[in-house]
């Protein structure tokens, strides 16, 4: 069974996964420190995991390893102007710590403060070890433990941990590098080129001409934020994205908070937003033409009949083939109407000394060019995974219940939804991890491992979006099956029933004791 020591809990550890090269030499010998559960990553998912572990598995020792020097994950990394959530905070926030602000669409600083405040309020901070970059994890069926190797600090000091259960909460973004296409003539440009993922603190753009390359969530966030200080901001896009305006405050939530206790008002608002989001997504899939017409009608209402909506705001794909872009309080459209910002739909021929030459022959002069061209994905944070000496490739694995890899024992992954707030699924995953750990203890099992009993069944990519960052990573992403529990459902109600209330044991989950092989050939 999984070990635990309620009398002498081990201080939590916070570490992150490898962000750079994946072929570093193994750390030198070091005394391994054992924990019942090792969590990797201290963003939204990691803090959520810490809360559920200490609440539902109070006798277990756990630690959180964080590769960076601060709590917050994505929300500590991204510092570009206007950074904000495109999900409401009643669902992006935790169920156990209600969001109190009237603004439901929060800026990055408010979200970061919320995550830090949660870690402090529930004593999760003391379980975090910063500057721990995880390189590899090796499972031994003989001991029923993972051995996790990491480096610490700028000197890369070796550190080793063992754990009975490994929970990866590091997301799927590559923190080290964003996606940057190579354009001809970039070296000729006399201005400054920046990527939003690594925003320079010294960038001055007051009164300057700015071109933002891209049309996704980052680009539509940057345009209105930078337009407040720049002389003019142009969003250059190769093709349009669906853009939906929404108030940053939730009037229904405000009404409920005036009439109900705070916790009850939060739950009601959370469920209202969950159900409305599911309804809109399902309507988009079943009646895409209807949803498309309503979205474009909203854009025309913002920009007027003379604006070329067809060229600049009408995508060639259906709603939710890619994520929709949310603009709070119509800020993007207000910037365009004011003349401080504009949208150009074209392709880059080359950089020039003064800006960009487009395929159409048009030139865009710029002092600053921002490449909001997307993210790169990194599965399991780039760490190496081994089971009984065999290298495991997540791209060859299937997702079990959307949160575990096939044939990898005592390992779970916190993943969010592509069509709803990340935290909704991450919190359900943490709930299930705790249920699984407690079940193994009750039954005397040392390990569990998802096993596909019908390998010939259909397979599909685990992420079905057509977004560029997903398509670029198609060769590294795990797979999903066509039937449960191997089907990844982008549906909160379905996952709620499966992960919080469903059976832990099924025909696709194997259990065993230490000394019995958990590897696929065992």
Task: Name every feature range the model reports, one short phrase each.
Residues 4-19, 219, 242-245, 254, ...:
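C-terminal, flexible cofactor-proximal segment of oxidoreductases
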Residues 27-34, 38-39, 44, 48-70, ...:
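Rossmann-like dinucleotide-binding core of oxidoreductases
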Residues 71, 368, 372-440:
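Glycine/threonine-rich phosphate-binding loop and adjacent beta-strand/alpha-helix elements that clamp
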Residues 85-105, 135-137, 173, 178, ...:
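Catalytic cores of eukaryotic secretory-pathway lumenal/extracellular enzymes that build
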Residues 99-117, 129, 213, 283-292, ...:
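Short beta-strand to alpha-helix junction loop
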Residues 103-174, 350:
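Feature captures the FAD/FMN-dependent oxidoreductase FAD-binding
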